[in-house]
Amino acid sequence: MALRNGLIPLYVSVVTAVMFGMLAGFSGNVIAAEDSDSAETLSFSYRRLLPLEGGSNFRDLGGYPTDDGGQVKRGLLFRSGAMTGLTDNDQNYLDGFGFKTIVDLRSTEEIELYPNHWARESNIDYLRVPYSIVEMMAKAFEVSEQEDGDGHGGMYDSLLTAIKPQLKLYFEALLQGRAPLVVNCSAGQDRTGVTSALLLASLGVSREHIVEDYLLSTDFRRPLIEAGGVDLQEAAKTNGFAAMMLQYGEGKDPSLPSPLVTADGVPFISATLDGVKEQYGTVNAYLISELGLSDSDLVTLRGLYVN
């Protein structure tokens, strides 16, 4: 698995934020479930984090105010960590929302270890782009080597390039109105955090609220649920992601989520937003330049997902 001598022990520290890394109350319309009675019941069953037995960081992006005086619609846009641990009760509960689409940002190695049973057992479109996490993190490490400090800024910058195909897939699904939709990675905080930040910005949510939403992952994650009881020692014989997680987790408390801020308390997502602003001016300009969206697409997104 080693890409070059000594590489894995070095770059595995960079994988922290990508892999594994209180209730923000809001009002909004009743969620878009297929049955109106079910929708009304479900709308009162949570504020932002969904009450799942085997879920981690599965939450609603709705309710944030937008710059035109609107509010992101509730019950349509969700984000989550790995969903392998969802119980039958969880799946029945989620089916009440009428989910149409799952966009899985994880790698082939991660999905092999932690499959999404709900996607297989429910009538939901499951969208993903196959790639190797080992190769992605090697590229992220090359960027982080050039950064000061812990290298997280470089890693987050590299995410915009690394998951560009997935970002295109996500925004295409949104523009097609394939919601309720949930986007996820392993922890639901880094790849999902960047993806969600871009969406919220495109809908006119302030940077303050975007960062606020990003930081909620520290409280909402359940790392032991995400771990899924997998024997990493055995899995590491054939799975590069398992080997990486063994190295990263050595000597650490597996029940604690990794922090999402620098030693100085600056959220990692801030570097990404700063980089986008510096290079493109706005997130919308980035979406147009890099993901191929048009001005009319941005208007469509607001029409679909903002009250």
Task: Tell me the role of every PLM-derived stretch.
Residues 1, 18, 32-34:
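Non-Sec secretion/translocation targeting segments of pathogen effectors
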Residues 1-15:
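Bacterial N-terminal signal peptides that target proteins for export
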Residues 6, 25-27, 36:
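Intrinsic disorder/low-complexity detector
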Residues 11-25:
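Bacterial N-terminal signal peptides
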Residues 30-181, 195-307:
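Cys-dependent protein tyrosine phosphatase-like superfamily
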Residues 184:
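Residues at the beta-strand->loop junction immediately N-terminal to the Walker
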Residues 187-192:
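Ser/Thr-glycine-rich phosphate-binding loops at phosphate-binding pockets of nucleotides
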